[in-house]
């Protein structure tokens, strides 16, 4: 069976009034043709693309999304903070240093210093996020039902400054608003990421995963605020589609929200009687890329997962398998 080429959608006028009257003969780029999605990769493979290239592109499909700092004090409810960093920039004279302004403070600190502060605090557990594919990220919700979404959530505690910094950048890009999404920030992060790429070894899978996530969010954010992305194939496809239907960032007609916010039914919901997430547990700014994190149903899933994570995720299971050199045996 021949696969339909998804690169372009063409509106043809077939009679009658409606949207097609004003869009007759207009070619609109398909979201599957403009973004590196799985469907597009299959199409490219059928057209003769080298298999190794397809595998390399498939590797970037998994994305860390809705990153929050996880903090918990014994006897108190946990807190998941996506608003702990209110400003971020790369130091001009030392482009491997990321400076941040923390919520409630006015002075800049380096991520190196912030990392040391966090790892010495008993309440700091690490970062939580969900692992989604590009097409599962649907702007206002996620394409994974709650009963399955909890198996996509993970807790990651960085053991080095670079991985910690990448988590902070992910969290900041998701929560940034229109006023903070500046060309200057985009250029700074692009230069920083080029330096980071040189520090990713073939076995450092987690670092590569975080790095690829930053690339997706950076290019998507640029597209949302009408800047040309550095890499157009790294724009999340549903953000492209919503942008075509509604060019004004940060707002959307009710019909678009309805399309992207439809539920999955009770069969795939969390167990009956699951309590909602208490107020104040998830603290999230009104960002351009964190719509689902502000949704009460997503927060409910996060809270349920946190309370039951030892049952959902076996103790010794890691997000990525790691390989270490075996000790040399001297004879």
Swiss-Prot record:
User: Subcellular localization, per the record?
Assistant: Virion; Virion tegument; Host cytoplasm; Host Golgi apparatus
Keyword Transmembrane helix listed? The answer is no
Q: Which domain of life is it from?
A: Viruses
GO (cellular component) term, any one: host cell Golgi apparatus
- Coarsely, its chief localization is virion
Alphabetical keyword list: Host cytoplasm, Host Golgi apparatus, Virion, Virion tegument
A family per Pfam = Herpes_UL7
Q: What does this protein do?
A: Plays a critical role in cytoplasmic virus egress. Participates in the final step of tegumentation and envelope acquisition within the host cytoplasm.
Q: Which family does it belong to?
A: Belongs to the herpesviridae cytoplasmic envelopment protein 1 family.
* Subunit: Interacts with protein ORF7; this interaction localizes protein ORF53 to the host trans-Golgi network (TGN).
Protein name from the UniProt record: Cytoplasmic envelopment protein 1
């Amino acid at each position: 069976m021949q696969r339909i080429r998804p690169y372009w959608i063409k509106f043809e006028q077939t009679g009658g009034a409606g949207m097609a009257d004003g869009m007759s003969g207009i070619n609109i780029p398909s979201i599957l043709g403009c973004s590196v999605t799985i469907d597009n990769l299959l199409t490219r493979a059928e057209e003769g693309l080298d298999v190794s290239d397809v595998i390399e592109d498939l590797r970037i499909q998994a994305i860390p999304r809705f990153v929050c700092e996880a903090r918990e004090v014994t006897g108190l409810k946990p807190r998941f903070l996506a608003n702990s960093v209110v400003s971020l920039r790369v130091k001009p004279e030392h482009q491997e240093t990321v400076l941040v302004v923390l919520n409630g403070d006015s002075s800049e600190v380096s991520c190196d210093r912030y990392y040391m502060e966090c790892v010495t605090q008993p309440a700091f557990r690490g970062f939580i996020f969900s692992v989604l594919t590009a097409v599962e990220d649907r702007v206002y919700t996620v394409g994974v039902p709650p009963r399955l979404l909890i198996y996509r959530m993970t807790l990651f505690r960085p053991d080095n400054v670079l991985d910690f910094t990448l988590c902070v950048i992910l969290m900041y890009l998701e929560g940034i608003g229109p006023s903070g999404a500046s060309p200057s920030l985009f250029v700074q992060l692009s230069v920083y990421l080029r330096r980071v790429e040189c520090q990713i070894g073939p076995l450092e899978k987690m670092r590569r995963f975080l790095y690829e996530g930053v690339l997706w969010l950076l290019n998507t954010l640029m597209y949302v605020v009408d800047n040309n992305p550095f890499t157009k194939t790294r724009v999340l496809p549903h953000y492209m589609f919503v942008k075509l239907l509604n060019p004004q960032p940060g707002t959307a007609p009710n019909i678009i929200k309805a399309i992207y916010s439809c539920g999955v039914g009770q069969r795939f919901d969390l167990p009956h009687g699951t309590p909602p997430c208490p107020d104040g547990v998830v603290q999230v700014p009104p960002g351009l890329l964190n719509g689902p994190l502000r949704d009460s149903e997503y927060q409910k899933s996060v809270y349920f997962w946190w309370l039951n994570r030892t049952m959902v995720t076996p103790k010794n299971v890691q997000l990525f398998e790691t390989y270490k050199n075996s000790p040399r045996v001297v004879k």
